[in-house]
């Protein structure tokens, strides 16, 4: 991945401080795995949370964060949606927002990765299915074993 590309882990956003703190923890873990910075950014709402509730660090939203990047001369972005599937936030709001930002910065380049579910409802992401099965097994080992035997 090109070092010039800014990578944003993007959720819908929330007024609950915990949501932003959890997004930051995921972004930090991903940064460590990738060996490059991944920044926690929300589509909406989180910028309204009092920074004192966020360890003194203000939350940001895509529009503000990309504008700050434009001002710093950056033009290339990757958005990693932290969404199970392509909600309206991803299929409707984000494209409109990006077109608005493109008017401000025509040379902007944006890559949007798939949502967690994958590219098609007909072929869900197998790793997500396995992760959910792990949760079932952890919550009820005996019941999960019965389910796993029946389902295979």
Which ranges hold each PLM region?
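Extended amphipathic ligand-handling, pore-lining, and cofactor/metal-binding catalytic surfaces
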Residues: 1-152
């Amino acid at each position: 991945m090109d070092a010039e590309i800014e990578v944003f882990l993007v959720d819908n956003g929330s007024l609950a401080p915990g949501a932003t703190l959890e997004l930051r923890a995921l972004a930090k873990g991903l940064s460590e795995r990738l060996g490059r910075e991944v920044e926690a950014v929300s589509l909406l709402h989180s910028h309204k949370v009092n920074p004192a509730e966020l360890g003194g660090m203000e939350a940001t939203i895509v529009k503000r964060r990309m504008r700050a990047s434009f001002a710093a001369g950056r033009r290339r972005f990757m958005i990693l949606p932290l969404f199970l599937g392509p909600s309206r936030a991803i299929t409707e709001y984000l494209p409109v927002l990006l077109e608005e930002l493109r008017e401000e910065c025509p040379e902007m380049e944006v890559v949007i990765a798939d949502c967690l579910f994958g590219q098609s409802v007909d072929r869900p992401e197998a790793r997500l299915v396995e992760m959910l099965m792990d949760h079932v097994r952890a919550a009820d080992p005996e019941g999960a074993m019965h389910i796993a035997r029946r389902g295979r």
